[in-house]
Amino acid sequence: MDQTPLSDAKSRLAAEVDGRADVLLDVSRRIHAQPELGYEEHFAHDLLTGVLKDAGLAVTRSARGVDTAFEARAGGIGPLVAVVCEYDALPGIGHACGHNVIAAAGLGAGLAAAALAEELGGQVLVVGTPAEEGGGGKVRLIDGGTFKGVDAALMVHPADADLTAMDVVALQQAHVTYTGEAAHAAAFPHRGRNALDAAVLGYLNVAALRQHIAAGERLHGIITDGGDRPNIVPAYARTEWIVRSPTVAGLEVLKTRFLACLEAGATAAGCEMDLEWIDPVYADMIDSQAIVERYRANAEALGRIVRVPSPQARVVGSTDMGNVSYVVPSIHPMIRVAPPGVPIHTPAFTGFAGGPEGDAAVLDGAKALAFTVADLWLDGGLVERAQGEWREAVAGRSGAVAGGA
């Protein structure tokens, strides 16, 4: 088959990734072996920025005032494509979300693209985004201006299957405290106001509400403080919650119903309640169909079979990449790291992320992303189609919250 400029570019990008395979796999394994929680990823930050700087990219460490974020840029003119890296881990189970794979695949794509950027007439920005697991690192970078002028943003995420997208829903966390009045639980129970009762009644109200919420909506919580001794009426109780809905607009409606459940519990127990909504809001994901179809073709050219997620087998999650998708056309495809049925956020997945399956995903992910960067650089109409599609999608989703406002 004759080589077109685009196919020739992809062949050369693949060679760039292969030539760096030892470095990329070493980075993935080292990050996997030294898991760091959100905003504490100093080892990963220094490792990734060191490799990027050694390769000649213009590196900004601690970008936008975020200590463990970074930006690395190459190229002069042409479409600016951001390749996103994540590298925070989970408490107790390490890289059970496979962020070591995300970091190394993004690194590989960025290095390969940077090597050809000047020649192919494009720009690449490798963005290191800390604290995806609840800390909203990307939101801080959005607010700081990282994605201004970016034409598209790309990343891959490990999973137990190759998929064009994950079902990303909007999310906000809440911390709730209840204040009552302590009393001896046997001698003077009538003098007490039981804060734990208020928390439990609120929890049960939310449990009843779950029967009557929309598909894709989720309410999950824990009681973090319910008193000190059973013979003392608890004067203080505390709960933590996560509220999810398919869109930011739907999230606001669900939050109102959720709040009513908790307030009713506090009223019934005669206690005071204070609810703190934790920023940032994680937005739902607007997947660029124009771009993800190119990613799919590129990944399948590497031998992977990439499916469109089935509505009957929804895997619901949340990510601050959703916020990025409200400010620039974005994709968040899933790349297989584990066998079917091994979910993320489990110890079993941690093992696969650091094993041969994770290594294969690093190299395939780097190539598929780099190929997609080339599509955006060399297909003159792709950026325009993606941006037109994106503007229409954003306009159709009212109540969007992209940054931290």
Model-identified regions with their sequence ranges:
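Histidine/acidic-residue-rich, glycine-tolerant segments that coordinate divalent metal ions
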Residues: 68-71, 88-96, 100-101, 106-107, ...
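Metal-dependent amide/peptide-bond hydrolase catalytic core
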Residues: 5, 196, 200-405
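Short, small-residue-enriched loops and turns at beta-alpha junctions
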Residues: 34-39, 131-132, 161-163, 227-230, ...
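Histidine-centered active-site/metal-ligand motif
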Residues: 32-34, 88, 95, 99, ...
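Acidic-glycine-rich active-site phosphate/pyrophosphate-binding loop
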Residues: 74-86, 165-178, 338-348
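General small-molecule cofactor/ligand-binding pocket signal
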Residues: 60, 127, 274-276
